Each structure stands twice: as C-alpha cells, then as structure tokens.
C-alpha cells in the first residue's frame, strides 16, 4: 500500500493531444513528513503516519509538540496514518513524484460537503407524493415499515446530510506537476475547496495504464 496527503484546490479541465476534454480536480500535494512508523512488534499492525501543511507552534499543545519533535518536524495541520504502508523512516520527507506516476489509479478519501438538515427527497432521492390539493402528504417520507415498537437501524429518514467521510475509488491520475506540487485527478473528489484529502493506491481491479498526453497550449500559440 502507498499513499499521500493533499489539499483539494478546485476543478478545471484539460485537453489531450487528440483534442479530448478531460474534467480534472487540482490537488495540491505539499511534501509529506513521516511523523510515526508503526510496526507489528510495537503497535500490532503496520502503518505510517503522515503530516502535511505547517501550522503555528502556539496552536499546538505540549504532547502534540513533543510528537512532532520526535520526527524533527514542524507542527502539521493535517495528520493521518495509512495502514500497510512500509519502507519509510521517521522524519523522512515524501514528495508526490516519489509515490505516484501519471496513469495510475487511486482511491481518494475526504469529508463531503455538509448540506445541513435535509428531508427524504433530497437526502435519499425519495419520490415525491401527490401534489394535488386533497392528498394527505407531499414531501413526507410515508410509511416507516411494519407495525413494530421501534424503527429499524439504517432506516432512510430525514437528517443531517453530508459532512461525512467518503471515498471515491479508481480515479485516474492525469498529470503530476512536481515543481508546483500539483496533481491532476480525473473527475470529482469528496470535499469542498481547500479541504484535505487522502490519496491512496487503489484496492480494486483497475490497473495502471499509459499516461495521457496533454495538449501543449504554449506550443499551439507559438505555431
């Protein structure tokens, strides 16, 4: 397993050399620092804890500051561990080009946009009731099941929509711009602008393919 932490910037589009338009999400992947290395002997499982994006020292309590100092690192805003990732040393700095290449498929995990309290129609795509004047309901969820003294768990009902951890699988890496710490991922990913995401090696099916050749607009203008 391999992975890295990044920050969602925005969505845009690029063109391939064949003229095909590709929608992409721009992800800023600043250098990640290895803050902790977990092993089976010491922790019972294998994992690497990564951190990215510096934050001010006065925003960190003493236990956290001591944890960062063990890795000889500045305090980090976003810290996550990636299981089954090994082969890295405490304090090592990882760049996006050290982990991934264009054409690979990845799974992206983030916190989805919060929508507040939502009804069954918006939250679960329920059908709307009759809108005629004499109908008994319009946007209600209707029956909640059989006659029983409780509501079953996972029953789809109105409630807080969004603001939950979500993963989108098998997204293609279109391009990596290492000098600018930028990665272009095909399609959309969870979260709002400037939210942090985890980018990990995909775990299902899709294998890497040849990288897409993008259109060089500067060359077109000069011609």
Curated annotation (Swiss-Prot):
<comment type="similarity">
    <text>Belongs to the universal ribosomal protein uL3 family.</text>
</comment>
<dbReference type="GO" id="GO:0003735">
    <property type="term" value="F:structural constituent of ribosome"/>
</dbReference>
<dbReference type="GO" id="GO:0019843">
    <property type="term" value="F:rRNA binding"/>
</dbReference>
<dbReference type="InterPro" id="IPR019926">
    <property type="entry name" value="Ribosomal_uL3_CS"/>
</dbReference>
<keyword id="KW-0689">Ribosomal protein</keyword>
<keyword id="KW-0687">Ribonucleoprotein</keyword>
<keyword id="KW-0694">RNA-binding</keyword>
<comment type="subunit">
    <text>Part of the 50S ribosomal subunit. Forms a cluster with proteins L14 and L19.</text>
</comment>
<dbReference type="InterPro" id="IPR019927">
    <property type="entry name" value="Ribosomal_uL3_bac/org-type"/>
</dbReference>
<protein>
    <recommendedName>
        <fullName>Large ribosomal subunit protein uL3</fullName>
    </recommendedName>
</protein>
<dbReference type="InterPro" id="IPR000597">
    <property type="entry name" value="Ribosomal_uL3"/>
</dbReference>
<dbReference type="GO" id="GO:0022625">
    <property type="term" value="C:cytosolic large ribosomal subunit"/>
</dbReference>
<dbReference type="InterPro" id="IPR009000">
    <property type="entry name" value="Transl_B-barrel_sf"/>
</dbReference>
<comment type="function">
    <text>One of the primary rRNA binding proteins, it binds directly near the 3'-end of the 23S rRNA, where it nucleates assembly of the 50S subunit.</text>
</comment>
<dbReference type="Pfam" id="PF00297">
    <property type="entry name" value="Ribosomal_L3"/>
</dbReference>
<dbReference type="GO" id="GO:0006412">
    <property type="term" value="P:translation"/>
</dbReference>
<keyword id="KW-0699">rRNA-binding</keyword>
């Amino acid at each position: 397993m391999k992975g890295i932490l990044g920050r969602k910037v925005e969505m845009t589009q690029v063109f391939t050399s064949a003229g095909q338009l590709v929608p992409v999400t721009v992800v800023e992947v600043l250098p990640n620092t290895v803050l902790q290395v977990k092993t089976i002997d010491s922790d019972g499982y294998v994992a690497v804890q990564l951190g990215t994006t510096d934050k001010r020292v006065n925003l960190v309590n003493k236990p956290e500051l001591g944890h960062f100092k063990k890795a000889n690192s500045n305090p980090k805003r976003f810290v996550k561990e990636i299981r089954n990732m090994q082969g890295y040393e405490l304090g090592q700095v990882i760049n996006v080009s050290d982990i991934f290449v264009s054409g690979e498929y990845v799974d992206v995990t983030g916190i989805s946009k919060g929508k507040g309290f939502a009804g069954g129609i918006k939250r679960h795509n329920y059908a709307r009731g009759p809108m005629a004047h004499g109908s008994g309901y319009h946007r209600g969820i209707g029956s909640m099941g059989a006659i029983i003294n409780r509501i079953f768990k996972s029953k789809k009902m109105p409630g807080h929509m969004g603001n939950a951890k979500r993963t989108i699988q098998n997204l293609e890496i279109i391009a990596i711009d290492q000098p600018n710490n930028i990665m272009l991922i095909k399609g959309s990913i969870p979260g709002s602008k400037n939210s942090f995401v985890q980018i990990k090696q995909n775990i299902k099916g899709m294998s890497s393919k040849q990288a897409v050749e993008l259109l060089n607009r500067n060359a077109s203008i000069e011609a």
